[in-house]
Swiss-Prot record:
This protein's GO CC annotations: core mediator complex; mediator complex
Positions of the UniProt region annotated as Disordered: 41-66
Upper classification of the organism: Eukaryota, Fungi, Dikarya, Ascomycota, Saccharomycotina
Transcription regulation keyword on record: yes
GO biological process, one term: positive regulation of transcription elongation by RNA polymerase II
A GO term, aspect molecular function: transcription coregulator activity
General function of this protein: Component of the Mediator complex, a coactivator involved in the regulated transcription of nearly all RNA polymerase II-dependent genes. Mediator functions as a bridge to convey information from gene-specific regulatory proteins to the basal RNA polymerase II transcription machinery. Mediator is recruited to promoters by direct interactions with regulatory proteins and serves as a scaffold for the assembly of a functional preinitiation complex with RNA polymerase II and the general transcription factors.
Swiss-Prot/TrEMBL keywords: Activator, Nucleus, Transcription, Transcription regulation
Organism of this sequence: Candida glabrata (strain ATCC 2001 / BCRC 20586 / JCM 3761 / NBRC 0622 / NRRL Y-65 / CBS 138)
Protein name: Mediator of RNA polymerase II transcription subunit 5
Length: 1099
């Protein structure tokens, strides 16, 4: 070597960016040339021989032991290393030091060098040194190095670290040292005894500092200190209290296992039984809160101040005989935050591990909106707004909850590479719902920006400086300048005035308009401004619908239908669907009729006004269709001042609830369809329209002036159906004339007719495909469909509405169109390279158009792989149904899984409520109820309560039924008004009409017993699930009865409370011949139990 200086060698290597592993080879060559008498091999041998003598050396003696002289090679090298680290010119220099010290483990060098680190002034390079060392020890597997490390831990490493005064160093260095200690201490097989009080105090200060910086790391660090360090004759500051105050436990709603104190208590009688009862109470409370929160989200209930008071009253409603401690608001929010994240973890785990046969995600989106926006808003409005409230809540979240949430987000992160990271202890960049929660709180000023780093640094990396610290609503104007919105209503009005309707459906053009820009980034808007925007938009819609400001009404409705960045879903969470539903129902059924008559009596209205009149009706119907089909809003249950007669006379409700049905007869006035004059006029109107559309090739003014959009909404689908069926039987042969006539359906005033067409096509194309139809006929049908799905040109007023109509029923249509592809084996060739685009060009064009309509903004309950179009080979068959039954996942298995969940007293249902609702509707509520009751009765009677060693007492058996009935009541009832009405109904002894079978059906087969251990927390990870094996016997008779959900009078007939009441009243009638007196007594007991819960539960 030219230079005898290690410093010079290292700096030259760092300048050339030579890796640490290559530097080690150069270092060995330098060492052997510079110190030939102390070569690397000889030195290592001496180290191994002499290391054994250190085992019995006390910690303090090892530190005070003199080191070698100035001419000693070890001392020279240590001095050179200190110069390198002080230099700080290259970060890689710290990597070189770690490589020499630990990778090429040198005990004497470690003992000499580590005590000098406390004098190092360059703290940045010191942080990197500890981080790099930690990364090495985390993955260390070399037994020789581990044995040397264990000897040095006791003698050198731990004492050197604990000499540090942790009160005077930076937060970053505290975390780096803690992680280093955590990594090395895990290797020691026996606890290291510490005699020094200074070391004990410094350890306490380190843990205290860490708890203020990173709560999660602090928990883990305190745990390993408890295990690996023993402070002589001193009570360990990290020992946990063995007596837990169960009543005030911060884990009251956490799935963390709460050990029953029964085995560990010496007083066995009264005290142990009371403790066991408390444990059961906590478990039931956790279960109730889970269903309560899920039901509230499922039913779009408002989150206002009443929500907080109702939540606080849950425990007292469950246990009215217990004395309840009065919680202040901050403690209440601590519990609510912890409960909400726990419930979300259970929700995503159910979806990840139990629901592979569904694609539901609307309820998940509601959970995300609740945790990221609404919960921070509730904290901001109702709590003391102090950061320690949030800190305490996040501290209380169980580690398995965090693991479950992180695992779910990693599973759904398409961009994440799933390889094993060499340094897996390093922070990752994967974000989850906790980040969004804290970001919103930071916007509202509840917590500082550094809060997110302090609490989530353990496994996530976030730049706290980039976080928004105000709730300002901003947008970028056309000059590229960011503006702050101070007056939201004026901002909306000015944006609407400059908005071009044709740009509403173009994602690339939304940035040109302020409102579209804000809605397209709605998830980044602060909760307070989201709330203000939601209320301002609804107020403006209400005002414009009553004053007939149709330009405002049309544009606002059009913007909302596309749901950019989940904006419509968010608005529904803030104002509830009932408000919007009532608004649009009243516009269609009341305001529109009166206003249109007034407009028609006024002469001189412009073409622009005519278009707005027709388009306002069309957009209103489209919005109602979205609310009903995509958001599953039951119009009748909205209580929008509709009596039974009004419901029958409501055009909006009748239209939307019968979307796939196109009648074979058309009448101008459905109410007077028996009137001969109406029949003659209707026949003449249809004949004139057919003649103008398909013979004359143009529509006369008289036809256009004498028909209303309501009539067109029914006439257009009627004509479409009749013409298509006529072509199918060969009654019509001129395809070009038909195409020319269908093109008129794309005019703005006629587009409303396509709504029904899109739903009718689903069943028509299914029949066409299943009938082995001639290919020529299929080509003709596809050509006709191509006219309305992929038009060559569109009016600027038609463009956005046409795109929105395509989105309505695109998923089922895509599923059927895929079946028409010529590549019939594409789905079976899964994993084999094969192009999807082998079908008819017209067919592929329609498929592409439908996919593009879905891709511009969120659509719910669909398989996301449908929207992936850049793959050149089939990876996996897409799912076109949101719920499906397979041979592996049968109805019997699903029902049994849920029944076993009730029996096992899990803290959440096995399936999420959206999945369960479909399961219950498919089986019918009555069949579900009877099957579950029969099976639980059998299990409790013969097997007792799961995981209870002895045969259960009556109280324990009752708890299983209680779990079921709390679910039934919360599933049925949305609010206290419904509960009062149902209670009054069930207390009435007047007979009711009986529909369908009633009575308890005798069980012919006994369900197979299950003894798999299934702790409550295992539900989070799909472990020890209650699934039946493939060879288990069926426990139900598969029946699929049609549910009369659309009938106002029949709605309550499908609640569990109604069914129980119906069965009770049916005793003694002809329909109940199979019901014994014992069965009747049982149903009376269940009736009383349900009624009692109705009166005591919080809704």
């Amino acid at each position: 070597m030219e230079s005898k200086s290690l410093n010079t060698l290292a700096l030259r290597c760092a300048a050339r960016k030579i890796p640490a592993s290559e530097f080690l080879n150069l270092y060995k060559e330098f060492y052997n040339e510079t110190f030939p008498a102390n070569s690397i091999d000889n030195d290592d041998a001496k180290t191994q021989e002499g290391s054994g003598s250190q085992d019995k050396t006390d910690v303090e003696e090892s530190i005070s032991k003199p080191v070698g002289s100035k001419n000693d090679p070890v001392a020279i090298l240590c001095a050179e290393f200190m110069k390198l680290l002080e230099n700080g010119k290259y970060v890689i220099l710290a990597d070189y030091v770690v490589e020499v010290l630990f990778v090429n483990y040198h005990s004497e060098l470690v003992r000499e060098f580590l005590p000098k680190l406390k004098d190092l002034m360059n703290k940045g390079i010191l942080i990197h040194f500890f981080s790099k060392s930690c990364a090495f020890f985390v993955n260390l597997t070399d037994n020789l190095v581990i044995s040397q490390l264990i000897k040095d831990l006791r003698a050198t490493i731990v004492p050197c670290i604990l000499e540090t005064n942790f009160c005077d160093i930076s937060n970053e260095l505290v975390v780096a040292i803690a992680k280093f200690l955590q990594a090395v201490l895990r290797f020691t097989p026996q606890p290291i005894q510490i005699n020094s009080e200074t070391y004990r105090d410094n350890t306490f200060n380190l843990t205290k500092r860490l708890s203020l910086i990173n709560k999660i790391l602090s928990k883990k660090f305190a745990g390993i200190i408890d295990k690996k360090l023993q402070f002589k004759e001193v009570l360990g500051p990290f020992t946990k209290d063995s007596t837990l105050d169960f009543d005030n436990s911060p884990s009251i709603t956490s799935p963390q296992f709460i050990p029953s104190p029964l085995p560990s208590m010496k007083e066995r009688s009264v005290t142990s039984s009371q403790s066991a009862i408390k444990y059961k109470d906590l478990k039931l409370l956790r279960y109730y809160k889970n269903i309560w929160l899920n039901s509230k989200l499922m039913n779009w209930q408002p989150f206002d101040s009443e929500f907080i008071s109702n939540y606080s009253a849950i425990k007292s409603s469950l246990y009215p005989d217990q004395v309840q401690n009065i919680q202040n608001v901050d403690l209440l929010f601590t519990d609510l935050i912890e409960t909400a994240f726990t419930c979300f973890a259970q929700f995503v785990s159910n979806k990840l591990y139990h629901q592979s046969n569904s694609t539901y995600n609307l309820l998940e989106r509601k959970w995300i909106l609740f945790l990221s926006k609404i919960l921070p808003l509730l904290v901001y409005k109702n709590s003391s707004r102090t950061a320690h409230v949030i800190g305490n809540a996040l501290d209380g979240i169980d580690d398995k909850v965090i693991k479950a949430i992180s695992a779910y987000y990693q599973e759904n992160d398409d961009g994440r590479s799933r390889n094993d990271d060499l340094f897996d202890d390093y922070p990752s960049t994967s974000l989850d719902i906790r980040h969004d929660f804290i970001k919103s709180l930071t916007m509202l000023g509840v917590v500082p920006p550094v809060f997110i780093t302090n609490y989530l640094r353990g496994d996530q990396t976030v730049d706290s400086k980039a976080l928004a610290t105000t709730d300002d609503l901003t947008f970028t104007n056309q000059q590229g300048i960011i503006e702050i919105v101070n007056d939201i209503p004026n901002f909306i009005r000015s944006s609407l005035e400059g908005m071009e309707m044709e740009n509403v459906s173009e994602p690339t053009l939304v940035s040109s308009n302020g409102l579209l820009q804000v809605l397209s980034n709605f998830d980044t808007v602060s909760p307070t401004k989201q709330f203000e925007l939601a209320n301002a938009i609804v107020d403006m819609l209400s005002e414009s619908s009553t004053t007939f400001e149709l330009n405002t009404f049309v544009k606002l409705t059009a913007v909302l239908t596309f749901n950019y960045s989940h904006s419509l879903t968010s608005i529904l969470m803030y104002v509830t669907p009932e408000v919007l539903t009532k608004l649009y129902l009243e516009f269609v059924d009341k305001h529109w009729n009166s206003q249109v008559i007034g407009k028609q009596e006024t002469d001189g209205e412009s073409q622009f006004e005519n278009v707005n009149i027709s388009m306002s009706f069309s957009w209103a119907i489209l919005m109602l269709t979205i609310l009903y089909k995509q958001y599953h809003i039951d119009f009748v249950s909205m209580r929008a001042d509709y009596t039974t007669d009004n419901i029958k006379n409501s055009f909006a409700i009748t239209f939307v609830e019968n979307l796939p049905d196109i009648s074979d007869l058309f009448f101008i006035d459905e109410k007077n369809s028996d009137d001969p004059e109406v029949q003659v006029k209707s026949h003449k109107l249809v004949r004139d329209w057919l003649n103008d559309l398909f013979v004359n090739g143009s529509l006369s003014d008289s036809l256009l002036q004498n028909i209303e959009p309501k009539q067109l909404a029914i006439l257009v689908p009627y004509i479409f159906k009749q013409v298509t069926l006529a072509m199918e039987i060969g009654a019509v042969g001129d395809l070009q004339n038909l195409i020319g006539g269908f093109e008129y359906f794309l005019q703005p005033f006629m587009l409303v007719g396509l709504i029904k067409v899109m739903y009718w096509l689903e069943q028509y194309l299914s029949c066409l495909k299943s009938d082995e139809t001639d290919e020529k006929l299929i080509q003709k049908v596809l050509s006709l469909l191509n006219t309305i799905i992929c038009p060559s040109t569109l009016n600027e007023d038609s463009k956005a509405f046409h795109f929105a109509v395509l989105r309505l029923n695109a998923i089922p249509l895509l599923g059927i169109l895929y079946q028409f592809r010529s590549n019939k084996h594409a789905e079976s060739n899964y994993g084999i390279y094969s192009s999807d685009n082998e079908g008819n060009p017209t067919l592929e064009l329609m498929i592409s158009r439908l996919i593009s309509s879905l891709s511009i903004s969120p659509v719910y309950d669909i398989d996301s792989t449908i929207l992936v179009t850049d793959n050149n080979f089939v990876q996996k068959p897409p799912k076109f149904q949101s719920f499906f039954v397979t041979n592996e996942i049968s109805m019997n298995k699903m029902l049994t899984n849920q029944m076993n969940s009730f029996w096992s007293l899990h803290s959440s249902t096995y399936y999420n409520l959206d999945f369960l609702k479909t399961l219950i509707d498919t089986l019918t509520p009555k069949q579900f109820l009877l099957d579950v009751l029969r099976t639980l009765e059998y299990k409790v009677e013969t097997l007792g309560v799961k995981d209870v060693r002895n045969k259960s007492s009556s109280n324990e058996s009752d708890q299983v039924i209680d779990y079921l009935f709390y679910f039934l009541v919360l599933y049925d009832i949305e609010n206290s008004e419904d509960a009062k009405a149902m209670a009054q109904f069930m207390e009435d002894t007047v007979d009711i009409s009986i529909n369908g079978d009633s009575g308890i059906v005798k069980q012919e087969t006994q369900p197979k017993s299950e003894y798999n251990p299934d702790d409550d927390i295992d539900m989070l990870f799909g472990e020890n699930d209650t699934s039946m094996q493939a060879n288990e016997e069926d426990t139900l008779d598969n029946k699929e009865l049609k549910s009369d959900r659309n009938c106002a009078l029949g709605k309550n007939r499908h609640t569990f409370g109604f069914i129980i009441h119906e069965i009770k009243l049916s005793y003694g009638t002809l329909e109940s011949d199979s019901m014994s007196y014992e069965d009747y007594k049982k149903i009376c007991e269940y009736h009383s139990r349900y009624l009692k819960m109705l009166k005591t539960c919080i809704f």
